[in-house]
Amino acid sequence: IFGGTFAKNGEYPWMVVIDLPEFACGGVLISKKFVLTAAH
């Protein structure tokens, strides 16, 4: 993201990051049990 800024911890509590050594992916909490991610 060009021109973006870092978010503070807790600023977007519905956002999720899945950060593994092989890849990183983002998601969004849609309930207390489920995370919605892109299919890639």
Swiss-Prot record:
Molecular-function GO terms, alphabetical: serine-type endopeptidase activity; signaling receptor binding
Cysteine pairings via disulfide bonds: none
Keyword annotations from UniProtKB, A to Z: Secreted
Secreted found in the keyword field: yes
Predominant cellular place of this UniProt entry's protein: secreted
Family label: Belongs to the peptidase S1 family.
Note: The molecular weight determined on 2D-gel is 33 kDa.
Listed name of the protein: Serine proteinase-like BMK-CBP
Native source species: Olivierus martensii (Manchurian scorpion)
